[in-house]
C-alpha cells in the first residue's frame, strides 16, 4: 500500500468550501465548526503512523527470492548435489570440502591418502588387473570411463554405496604409480544444511579390500615411522 493511500484511509476527508460556509454562519456557529476539525497537533502523529504501516507492510516480493534469479546457489547442501569427476589439471581431484565421505591422493585434499605403487614383479596389465579387482570386491560395478590421457590411463567406475546411492571410484595409472579418489555421492547434512555428517571410514574400508586383492603397495603414515 502506498503512502498516499495510507494517508487517505487514516486522515479524515477535507471539508469542501469550509471557508465559504464559515463566512455565512454566526460567530457562535463558526466556533462550533472550528471545534469539530481535528487538532493540528494530531497530524504529525497520524503521518508517522501511516509511514510505519507502509514501511512494515508485508511484501511477498521482498520476502521470497525470485525463481528467475541468476545468482547461483552456494550452500554446502546444493554444492554437494553436483559431483565433479575426471582429471583436474592432469591430476586426480581433491575431495570436496562439503563431502566427508571421500579419500583422495591429491595432496590438497582434506582426507589424504598415499598413491599406490605397483611392484616390479607384477607383469599383468594394471588396468585389466584393476578392473578385475573392482569387479570382485565391489557390488554392482559399472565402468563409466576408460581412457588414455597425456597424464596416464584414467579409470572411473560407479559402485554400490550405502542405501540406494552410487559411489565413485577414480584411478590414474602412470607407469608404476596409481593415484585415486573414492567418494560417496550421497552426503547427509545436519540442519540447517551447513554441516555435513559422516567420515571417510567407509571409503577407507572399500579401498583396503581392493588393495588386498591387487597386492599393490599402499604406503601409510604409520609405515613411515
Swiss-Prot record:
InterPro entries registered for this protein in UniProt: Thylakoid_lumenal_17.9
Any single Gene Ontology cellular-component annotation: chloroplast
Signal peptide location: none
Swiss-Prot/TrEMBL keywords: Chloroplast, Plastid, Thylakoid, Transit peptide
Protein name: Thylakoid lumenal 17.9 kDa protein, chloroplastic
Organism lineage string: Eukaryota, Viridiplantae, Streptophyta, Embryophyta, Tracheophyta
Subcellular location: Plastid, Chloroplast thylakoid lumen
Disulfide feature: none
Species of provenance: Arabidopsis thaliana (Mouse-ear cress)
Bilayer-spanning residue ranges: none
